[in-house]
Swiss-Prot record:
Protein source organism: Mus musculus
TM stretches of this protein: 38-58, 82-102, 112-132, 134-154, 190-210, 214-234, 265-285, 303-323, 330-350, 360-380, 391-411, 417-437
Function: Lysosomal dipeptide uniporter that selectively exports lysine, arginine or histidine-containing dipeptides with a net positive charge from the lysosome lumen into the cytosol. Could play a role in a specific type of protein O-glycosylation indirectly regulating macrophages migration and tissue invasion. Also essential for liver homeostasis.
Protein name: Lysosomal dipeptide transporter MFSD1
Record keyword Phosphoprotein present: yes
Underlying gene: Mfsd1
Swiss-Prot/TrEMBL GO biological process terms: dipeptide transmembrane transport from lysosomal lumen to cytosol; protein localization to lysosome; protein stabilization
Result after altering N449A: No change in molecular weight, indicating lack of N-glycosylation
Assigned protein family: Belongs to the major facilitator superfamily.
Induction entry: After 24 hours of starvation, up-regulated in the brainstem and down-regulated in the cortex and striatum. Following 8 weeks of high-fat diet, down-regulated in brainstem and hypothalamus.
CDD domains with a match to the protein in the record: MFS_MFSD1 (cd17340)
Amino acid sequence: MEDEDGEDRALLGGRREADSAVHGAPRALSALCDPSRLAHRLVVLSLMCFLGFGSYFCYDNPAALQTQVKRDMQVNTTKFMLLYAWYSWPNVVLCFLGGFLIDRIFGIRWGTVIFSCFVCIGQVIFALGGIFNAFWLMELGRFVFGIGGESLAVAQNTYAVSWFKGKELNLVFGLQLSMARIGSTVNMNLMGWLYGKIEALLGSAGHMTLGVTLMIGCITCIFSLICALALAYLDRRAEKILHKEQGKTGEVIKLRDIKDFSLPLILVFVICVCYYVAVFPFIGLGKVFFMEKFRFSSQSASAINSIVYIISAPMSPLFGLLVDKTGKNIIWVLYAVAATLVSHMMLAFTFWNPWIAMCLLGFSYSLLACALWPMVAFIVPEHQLGTAYGFMQSIQNLGLAVIAILAGMILDSKGYLLLEVFFIACVSLSLLAVVCLYLVNRAQGGNLNYSAKQRERMKLSHPE
């Protein structure tokens, strides 16, 4: 208990400092009101977790309403997948600029509020596109939504680093990711049901029903905006009481660092892009796939399509702990990519219960994120981390934008079987890149595949 209290005081300033800062009076604040106390930081943590809830809830609105969007807006799958492509396009650039805008232009508090406003406005425009039967307006809404979505995640992480440090931080990141996946899961299972209720209320299906349903979904974005405003107030208050600095991302983006990227880092980029383009576009198109191939009802198809996110919510923190304790990142990535390949092959070539394949995909997706992304920190020096992660997210969004359009074209012209073969090819390329990374890393000393004990020994033998 004494150590924990000491950590709290070191984290955000001493309690004595907090007491003396309020109107100059040396009286103690209550635990809920004292920014240096755990109870207050738990309130802040809950606001941080809900900060991204609306964004993740609304991101997969098109997937949850795939049938309704295509029918009511009279568009084919290629145009439908543009709703995902338009989200990704701005983030090809904003992944480099988001941290800069937060650090140098807006500050963390205003940056979070502004990006939350972009998310809200984008969702409103998206819903208005349905109400006015204007698909171009829906595309515009997704573009505006995308401007805020990814940068809001950067702001969320910046708040986390500002308020929590050391051993707490991994748990906080895990809880934030879990809440994000809960938002995606609730969307997948709620929006179809909500559409049915609105349809019964208005007396018919159509673009108006779709637009009203999407507008109701905007409530989650407004809720997240309220959390952003509350966080800004509490962070400003803590800054005054504890005399602490406003949080910064710590990202230093230098495009000239790209020329120094090594072969292992390039292979990590290839693994990342080829893997995620076989997951997110598949989920975006998955509902109708399960309805057509496996004869699921609309509600059952939504449920199985959301299982990846349901599994990811509790398993991401657990897998993060597992990788931290064991090391061997490349081996875990190899297992994750191989399991994903098996999952897609089962869905493509068998009629086995798809719950098996989707659960396998959920576990492998969660494991890959925990093992792949930390590897970047083992490859590049600390001063290049911002550039490396920014570039990784940028090309990931570029890949998602291009593959979303391509997947829609394949589905329209060739059907789901060839689309699954295409996804299998993407995962196979990712698997090949993992094998190449293993061989290259082995030739260079094998640091990416060190066990946790080996890494600990390396730290002790090379103190900073």
